[in-house]
UniProtKB/Swiss-Prot annotation:
Coiled coil: none annotated. It is a multi-pass membrane protein. Its cofactor is heme b. It comes from Myotis mystacinus (Whiskered bat). One of its GO terms (molecular function) is ubiquinol-cytochrome-c reductase activity. Binds 2 heme b groups non-covalently. The chain crosses the membrane at residues 33-53, 77-98, 113-133, 178-198, 226-246, 288-308, 320-340, 347-367. Heme 1 (or BL or b562) is low-potential and absorbs at about 562 nm, and heme 2 (or BH or b566) is high-potential and absorbs at about 566 nm. This is Cytochrome b. CDD domains: cytochrome_b_C, Cytochrome_b_N. It is found in: Mitochondrion inner membrane.
Amino acid sequence: MTNIRKSHPLVKIINSSFIDLPAPSNISSWWNFGSLLGICLMLQILTGLFLAMHYTSDTATAFNSVTHICRDVNYGWVLRYLHANGASMFFICLYLHVGRGLYYGSYMYTETWNIGVILLFAVMATAFMGYVLPWGQMSFWGATVITNLLSAIPYIGTDLVEWIWGGFSVDKATLTRFFAFHFLLPFIISAMVMVHLLFLHETGSNNPTGIPSNMDMIPFHPYYTIKDILGLLLMITALLVLVLFSPDMLGDPDNYMPANPLNTPPHIKPEWYFLFAYAILRSIPNKLGGVLALVLSILILIIIPLLHTSKQRSMTFRPLSQCLFWLLVADLLTLTWIGGQPVEHPYVIIGQIASILYFSIIIMFMPLASLAENHLLKW
Protein backbone atom coordinates (compact mmCIF):
# COMPACT_ATOMS: atom_id res chain seq x y z
CA MET A 1 0.00 0.00 0.00
CA THR A 2 1.30 3.48 -0.89
CA ASN A 3 2.10 5.85 1.95
CA ILE A 4 -0.86 8.27 2.46
CA ARG A 5 1.75 11.02 2.75
CA LYS A 6 2.64 10.49 -0.91
CA SER A 7 -0.74 9.51 -2.35
CA HIS A 8 -3.45 11.70 -0.76
CA PRO A 9 -4.04 14.78 -3.00
CA LEU A 10 -3.90 17.29 -0.11
CA VAL A 11 -1.33 15.60 2.12
CA LYS A 12 1.13 15.13 -0.74
CA ILE A 13 1.20 18.92 -1.31
CA ILE A 14 2.19 19.39 2.34
CA ASN A 15 4.67 16.50 1.99
CA SER A 16 6.40 18.01 -1.03
CA SER A 17 6.52 21.45 0.63
CA PHE A 18 7.58 20.70 4.21
CA ILE A 19 8.64 17.03 4.58
CA ASP A 20 10.32 15.49 1.52
CA LEU A 21 11.37 18.88 0.13
CA PRO A 22 15.02 18.66 -1.02
CA ALA A 23 16.98 21.43 0.74
CA PRO A 24 20.67 22.43 0.46
CA SER A 25 22.77 20.77 3.16
CA ASN A 26 24.56 23.98 4.14
CA ILE A 27 21.87 26.65 4.67
CA SER A 28 22.56 28.67 7.82
CA SER A 29 20.29 30.19 10.47
CA TRP A 30 19.68 33.15 8.13
CA TRP A 31 17.32 30.78 6.28
CA ASN A 32 15.17 30.40 9.43
CA PHE A 33 13.33 33.69 9.01
CA GLY A 34 10.94 32.47 6.30
CA SER A 35 9.37 29.97 8.69
CA LEU A 36 9.43 32.54 11.52
CA LEU A 37 7.51 34.97 9.28
CA GLY A 38 4.90 32.27 8.66
CA ILE A 39 4.53 31.77 12.43
CA CYS A 40 4.30 35.56 12.97
CA LEU A 41 1.55 35.81 10.35
CA MET A 42 -0.45 33.01 11.99
CA LEU A 43 0.03 34.57 15.44
CA GLN A 44 -1.11 37.98 14.17
CA ILE A 45 -4.20 36.53 12.46
CA LEU A 46 -5.17 34.56 15.59
CA THR A 47 -4.62 37.36 18.14
CA GLY A 48 -6.20 39.85 15.71
CA LEU A 49 -9.28 37.66 15.31
CA PHE A 50 -9.86 37.52 19.07
CA LEU A 51 -9.22 41.26 19.43
CA ALA A 52 -11.74 41.97 16.65
CA MET A 53 -14.39 40.13 18.68
CA HIS A 54 -14.19 42.89 21.34
CA TYR A 55 -13.12 45.94 19.31
CA THR A 56 -15.56 48.54 17.97
CA SER A 57 -14.54 50.60 14.94
CA ASP A 58 -16.38 53.78 15.90
CA THR A 59 -14.61 57.04 16.78
CA ALA A 60 -16.72 57.43 19.93
CA THR A 61 -15.92 53.98 21.35
CA ALA A 62 -12.72 52.68 19.66
CA PHE A 63 -10.31 53.99 22.33
CA ASN A 64 -12.56 52.77 25.16
CA SER A 65 -13.00 49.35 23.52
CA VAL A 66 -9.21 48.85 23.54
CA THR A 67 -9.12 49.88 27.22
CA HIS A 68 -12.01 47.44 27.85
CA ILE A 69 -10.02 44.64 26.15
CA CYS A 70 -7.03 45.32 28.42
CA ARG A 71 -9.02 45.64 31.66
CA ASP A 72 -12.14 43.49 31.42
CA VAL A 73 -11.57 40.73 28.85
CA ASN A 74 -9.92 37.56 30.21
CA TYR A 75 -6.26 37.78 29.20
CA GLY A 76 -7.23 40.64 26.88
CA TRP A 77 -4.03 42.50 27.81
CA VAL A 78 -1.99 39.46 26.69
CA LEU A 79 -3.84 39.40 23.35
CA ARG A 80 -3.43 43.13 22.81
CA TYR A 81 0.30 43.20 23.61
CA LEU A 82 1.02 39.96 21.73
CA HIS A 83 -0.60 41.57 18.69
CA ALA A 84 1.21 44.93 19.06
CA ASN A 85 4.64 43.45 19.81
CA GLY A 86 4.03 40.56 17.39
CA ALA A 87 3.99 43.23 14.67
CA SER A 88 7.45 44.35 15.83
CA MET A 89 8.76 40.77 15.71
CA PHE A 90 7.17 40.42 12.26
CA PHE A 91 9.13 43.43 10.97
CA ILE A 92 12.39 42.34 12.63
CA CYS A 93 12.07 38.97 10.85
CA LEU A 94 11.03 40.71 7.60
CA TYR A 95 14.02 43.04 7.52
CA LEU A 96 16.44 40.20 8.40
CA HIS A 97 14.82 38.02 5.70
CA VAL A 98 15.22 40.77 3.07
CA GLY A 99 18.78 41.47 4.27
CA ARG A 100 19.62 37.76 3.89
CA GLY A 101 18.21 37.86 0.33
CA LEU A 102 20.39 40.87 -0.48
CA TYR A 103 23.57 39.41 1.02
CA TYR A 104 23.35 35.95 -0.51
CA GLY A 105 21.95 36.98 -3.91
CA SER A 106 18.59 35.27 -3.42
CA TYR A 107 17.08 38.10 -5.50
CA MET A 108 18.30 36.24 -8.60
CA TYR A 109 15.11 34.18 -8.25
CA THR A 110 13.21 37.17 -9.66
CA GLU A 111 9.64 35.83 -9.36
CA THR A 112 10.10 34.89 -5.70
CA TRP A 113 11.85 38.22 -5.02
CA ASN A 114 9.19 40.37 -6.73
CA ILE A 115 6.33 38.63 -4.89
CA GLY A 116 8.36 39.19 -1.70
CA VAL A 117 8.60 42.94 -2.37
CA ILE A 118 4.82 43.11 -2.97
CA LEU A 119 4.35 41.17 0.29
CA LEU A 120 6.55 43.73 2.09
CA PHE A 121 4.33 46.57 0.81
CA ALA A 122 1.18 44.67 1.84
CA VAL A 123 2.50 44.02 5.37
CA MET A 124 3.52 47.68 5.73
CA ALA A 125 0.04 48.83 4.64
CA THR A 126 -1.58 46.40 7.10
CA ALA A 127 0.63 47.57 9.98
CA PHE A 128 -0.07 51.23 9.22
CA MET A 129 -3.85 50.69 9.23
CA GLY A 130 -3.62 48.62 12.41
CA TYR A 131 -1.79 51.47 14.17
CA VAL A 132 -4.76 53.77 13.46
CA LEU A 133 -7.33 51.46 15.11
CA PRO A 134 -6.74 52.21 18.86
CA TRP A 135 -7.68 55.84 18.01
CA GLY A 136 -5.10 57.45 20.27
CA GLN A 137 -3.36 60.76 19.51
CA MET A 138 -0.56 59.19 17.45
CA SER A 139 -3.07 56.93 15.65
CA PHE A 140 -5.14 59.91 14.53
CA TRP A 141 -2.29 62.23 13.60
CA GLY A 142 -0.25 59.46 11.99
CA ALA A 143 -3.24 58.62 9.79
CA THR A 144 -3.77 62.32 8.97
CA VAL A 145 -0.13 62.97 8.05
CA ILE A 146 0.50 59.80 6.02
CA THR A 147 -2.78 59.78 4.06
CA ASN A 148 -2.34 63.51 3.41
CA LEU A 149 0.90 62.71 1.55
CA LEU A 150 -1.24 61.49 -1.36
CA SER A 151 -2.38 65.09 -1.88
CA ALA A 152 1.10 65.68 -3.36
CA ILE A 153 0.04 63.71 -6.46
CA PRO A 154 -0.61 66.33 -9.16
CA TYR A 155 -4.19 67.04 -10.27
CA ILE A 156 -5.96 64.09 -8.56
CA GLY A 157 -4.22 64.32 -5.16
CA THR A 158 -6.84 66.21 -3.12
CA ASP A 159 -9.75 64.17 -4.52
CA LEU A 160 -7.83 60.96 -3.81
CA VAL A 161 -7.20 61.91 -0.16
CA GLU A 162 -10.85 62.86 0.43
CA TRP A 163 -11.92 59.61 -1.23
CA ILE A 164 -9.68 57.59 1.13
CA TRP A 165 -10.86 59.60 4.15
CA GLY A 166 -14.52 59.27 3.19
CA GLY A 167 -14.97 62.95 4.08
CA PHE A 168 -12.99 66.14 4.61
CA SER A 169 -10.87 64.82 7.47
CA VAL A 170 -9.85 61.57 9.16
CA ASP A 171 -13.09 60.58 10.90
CA LYS A 172 -15.56 57.75 11.55
CA ALA A 173 -15.66 56.63 7.89
CA THR A 174 -11.84 56.44 7.79
CA LEU A 175 -11.62 54.35 10.95
CA THR A 176 -14.32 51.92 9.78
CA ARG A 177 -12.69 51.31 6.39
CA PHE A 178 -9.22 50.98 7.94
CA PHE A 179 -10.59 48.29 10.26
CA ALA A 180 -12.19 46.48 7.30
CA PHE A 181 -8.95 46.54 5.30
CA HIS A 182 -6.80 45.70 8.33
CA PHE A 183 -8.94 42.58 8.84
CA LEU A 184 -8.93 41.61 5.14
CA LEU A 185 -5.29 42.18 4.14
CA PRO A 186 -3.66 39.42 6.29
CA PHE A 187 -5.74 36.82 4.44
CA ILE A 188 -4.64 38.27 1.09
CA ILE A 189 -1.06 38.19 2.45
CA SER A 190 -1.54 34.49 3.34
CA ALA A 191 -2.57 33.74 -0.26
CA MET A 192 0.44 35.68 -1.58
CA VAL A 193 2.72 33.72 0.76
CA MET A 194 1.49 30.54 -0.97
CA VAL A 195 2.49 32.05 -4.34
CA HIS A 196 5.85 33.14 -2.85
CA LEU A 197 6.50 29.51 -1.77
CA LEU A 198 5.22 28.14 -5.08
CA PHE A 199 7.81 30.19 -6.99
CA LEU A 200 10.54 29.30 -4.46
CA HIS A 201 9.86 25.56 -4.78
CA GLU A 202 10.13 25.84 -8.58
CA THR A 203 13.83 26.69 -8.21
CA GLY A 204 14.73 25.35 -4.77
CA SER A 205 16.52 27.32 -2.05
CA ASN A 206 19.70 29.30 -2.54
CA ASN A 207 22.59 28.64 -0.11
CA PRO A 208 25.39 30.70 1.52
CA THR A 209 27.93 29.94 -1.23
CA GLY A 210 25.58 31.00 -4.03
CA ILE A 211 26.70 27.88 -5.94
CA PRO A 212 23.98 25.44 -7.19
CA SER A 213 23.57 22.66 -4.63
CA ASN A 214 21.56 20.15 -6.69
CA MET A 215 24.16 17.44 -6.11
CA ASP A 216 24.08 17.81 -2.32
CA MET A 217 20.51 18.00 -0.99
CA ILE A 218 18.93 16.68 2.23
CA PRO A 219 15.23 16.23 3.14
CA PHE A 220 13.64 19.21 4.88
CA HIS A 221 12.28 16.93 7.62
CA PRO A 222 13.79 16.18 10.16
CA TYR A 223 16.87 18.38 9.61
CA TYR A 224 15.31 21.79 8.99
CA THR A 225 12.06 21.18 10.89
CA ILE A 226 14.07 20.78 14.11
CA LYS A 227 16.21 23.79 13.19
CA ASP A 228 13.08 25.89 12.56
CA ILE A 229 11.63 24.79 15.92
CA LEU A 230 14.78 26.10 17.66
CA GLY A 231 14.40 29.44 15.84
CA LEU A 232 10.72 29.51 16.81
CA LEU A 233 11.51 28.90 20.50
CA LEU A 234 14.04 31.75 20.50
CA MET A 235 11.60 34.14 18.81
CA ILE A 236 8.68 33.21 21.10
CA THR A 237 10.98 33.68 24.12
CA ALA A 238 11.99 37.16 22.92
CA LEU A 239 8.34 38.05 22.20
CA LEU A 240 7.12 36.84 25.61
CA VAL A 241 9.91 38.73 27.41
CA LEU A 242 8.81 41.87 25.56
CA VAL A 243 5.08 41.31 26.19
CA LEU A 244 5.35 40.32 29.86
CA PHE A 245 8.11 42.66 31.05
CA SER A 246 7.98 45.82 28.93
CA PRO A 247 4.95 45.71 26.62
CA ASP A 248 5.00 49.46 25.92
CA MET A 249 8.72 49.78 25.21
CA LEU A 250 8.26 50.02 21.44
CA GLY A 251 4.99 52.00 21.53
CA ASP A 252 4.36 55.73 21.80
CA PRO A 253 3.08 57.19 25.11
CA ASP A 254 0.96 59.69 23.11
CA ASN A 255 -1.23 56.80 21.99
CA TYR A 256 -2.57 56.48 25.55
CA MET A 257 -4.32 59.82 25.01
CA PRO A 258 -7.63 59.67 23.10
CA ALA A 259 -7.52 61.18 19.59
CA ASN A 260 -8.06 64.94 19.64
CA PRO A 261 -8.29 66.71 16.25
CA LEU A 262 -7.80 70.10 17.99
CA ASN A 263 -4.46 69.25 19.62
CA THR A 264 -1.41 68.24 17.56
CA PRO A 265 1.29 66.17 19.37
CA PRO A 266 4.71 67.92 19.45
CA HIS A 267 6.43 65.13 17.50
CA ILE A 268 4.36 63.06 15.07
CA LYS A 269 6.20 59.84 14.26
CA PRO A 270 5.25 56.32 13.13
CA GLU A 271 6.13 53.02 14.81
CA TRP A 272 9.88 52.22 14.96
CA TYR A 273 9.78 49.90 11.92
CA PHE A 274 8.77 52.77 9.60
CA LEU A 275 11.21 55.36 10.96
CA PHE A 276 13.90 54.79 8.28
CA ALA A 277 11.37 55.50 5.49
CA TYR A 278 9.94 58.45 7.47
CA ALA A 279 13.46 59.92 7.79
CA ILE A 280 13.92 59.65 3.99
CA LEU A 281 10.52 61.34 3.49
CA ARG A 282 11.45 64.23 5.82
CA SER A 283 14.93 64.72 4.38
CA ILE A 284 13.52 66.21 1.14
CA PRO A 285 12.08 69.74 1.57
CA ASN A 286 9.61 69.26 -1.32
CA LYS A 287 6.34 67.40 -0.61
CA LEU A 288 6.09 65.45 -3.89
CA GLY A 289 9.85 64.73 -3.86
CA GLY A 290 9.58 63.38 -0.32
CA VAL A 291 6.66 61.11 -1.21
CA LEU A 292 8.55 59.78 -4.26
CA ALA A 293 11.67 59.11 -2.16
CA LEU A 294 9.52 57.35 0.46
CA VAL A 295 7.98 54.99 -2.11
CA LEU A 296 11.30 54.46 -3.92
CA SER A 297 13.09 53.58 -0.66
CA ILE A 298 11.17 50.26 -0.73
CA LEU A 299 10.40 49.99 -4.46
CA ILE A 300 14.16 50.13 -5.22
CA LEU A 301 14.27 46.47 -4.10
CA ILE A 302 12.47 45.53 -7.35
CA ILE A 303 15.42 46.69 -9.50
CA ILE A 304 18.13 45.01 -7.43
CA PRO A 305 18.35 41.95 -9.75
CA LEU A 306 19.04 44.40 -12.62
CA LEU A 307 21.88 46.03 -10.64
CA HIS A 308 23.69 42.71 -10.07
CA THR A 309 26.98 43.06 -11.98
CA SER A 310 29.06 40.43 -10.16
CA LYS A 311 30.03 37.11 -11.73
CA GLN A 312 29.34 35.55 -8.32
CA ARG A 313 25.88 35.28 -6.82
CA SER A 314 26.53 35.53 -3.09
CA MET A 315 28.61 38.09 -1.16
CA THR A 316 30.33 35.30 0.84
CA PHE A 317 33.58 35.61 -1.16
CA ARG A 318 33.33 39.34 -2.01
CA PRO A 319 34.91 41.51 0.72
CA LEU A 320 34.31 44.88 -1.03
CA SER A 321 30.59 44.18 -1.43
CA GLN A 322 30.44 42.94 2.17
CA CYS A 323 31.82 46.26 3.44
CA LEU A 324 29.21 48.15 1.42
CA PHE A 325 26.44 45.85 2.63
CA TRP A 326 27.26 46.49 6.29
CA LEU A 327 27.62 50.21 5.55
CA LEU A 328 24.06 50.04 4.15
CA VAL A 329 22.87 48.32 7.35
CA ALA A 330 24.56 51.01 9.49
CA ASP A 331 23.00 53.68 7.25
CA LEU A 332 19.51 52.19 7.75
CA LEU A 333 20.03 52.13 11.53
CA THR A 334 21.12 55.80 11.36
CA LEU A 335 17.97 56.65 9.36
CA THR A 336 15.84 54.78 11.94
CA TRP A 337 17.39 56.88 14.72
CA ILE A 338 16.95 60.14 12.76
CA GLY A 339 13.29 59.34 12.01
CA GLY A 340 12.56 59.45 15.74
CA GLN A 341 14.31 62.81 16.31
CA PRO A 342 12.74 66.29 15.99
CA VAL A 343 13.24 68.28 12.77
CA GLU A 344 16.15 70.50 13.88
CA HIS A 345 19.89 70.88 13.42
CA PRO A 346 21.96 68.60 13.28
CA TYR A 347 19.34 65.85 12.69
CA VAL A 348 18.12 67.34 9.40
CA ILE A 349 21.54 67.30 7.72
CA ILE A 350 22.40 63.84 9.11
CA GLY A 351 19.10 62.53 7.69
CA GLN A 352 19.81 64.10 4.28
CA ILE A 353 23.32 62.63 4.10
CA ALA A 354 22.05 59.20 5.22
CA SER A 355 19.24 59.31 2.61
CA ILE A 356 21.64 60.19 -0.23
CA LEU A 357 24.02 57.46 0.98
CA TYR A 358 21.19 54.88 1.07
CA PHE A 359 20.30 55.35 -2.61
CA SER A 360 23.96 55.81 -3.67
CA ILE A 361 25.12 52.52 -2.10
CA ILE A 362 22.35 50.53 -3.80
CA ILE A 363 22.35 52.19 -7.23
CA MET A 364 26.00 53.13 -7.67
CA PHE A 365 28.56 51.82 -5.16
CA MET A 366 27.44 48.16 -4.99
CA PRO A 367 27.37 47.57 -8.79
CA LEU A 368 30.77 49.34 -9.11
CA ALA A 369 32.28 47.27 -6.27
CA SER A 370 31.03 44.10 -8.00
CA LEU A 371 32.70 45.15 -11.27
CA ALA A 372 35.92 45.91 -9.37
CA GLU A 373 35.82 42.44 -7.77
CA ASN A 374 35.32 40.82 -11.19
CA HIS A 375 38.35 42.75 -12.46
CA LEU A 376 40.51 41.78 -9.45
CA LEU A 377 39.63 38.12 -10.04
CA LYS A 378 40.48 38.58 -13.77
CA TRP A 379 36.94 37.51 -14.75
